[in-house]
Amino acid sequence: AVVPYLIMKTAAMGRGKAKDAYDIYFIIKHYIGGVRELAKEFEPVRDKNIVIEVKDKLAGKFASENHAGPKDVADFMDLEDEESIEMIKRDAYEQVQALLNLI
């Protein structure tokens, strides 16, 4: 039930908990079969209003590597060096964008 989980986590973003963005990133990054397989999970519900709202919210929170979503991911991981922080922020942005482009 990955789609409802991602819907719930996306709805929770904005409550000041960096873990929500991290959980979204983790699921996308580590989904068995990759982001394409994860996107297939959305096929039966891609036109539902709640999924459209999720896409809009994720697109806003992860609009660039410097937006709130990637920043929250890096903050949650409590990284020390700037290079690692920038790499994680970039990866979080790219992972979410890959999913958004497929659903």
What are the functions of these language-model segments?
Residues 1-48, 52-64, 68-100:
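Catalytic cores of NTP-dependent nucleotidyl/adenyl transfer enzymes across multiple folds
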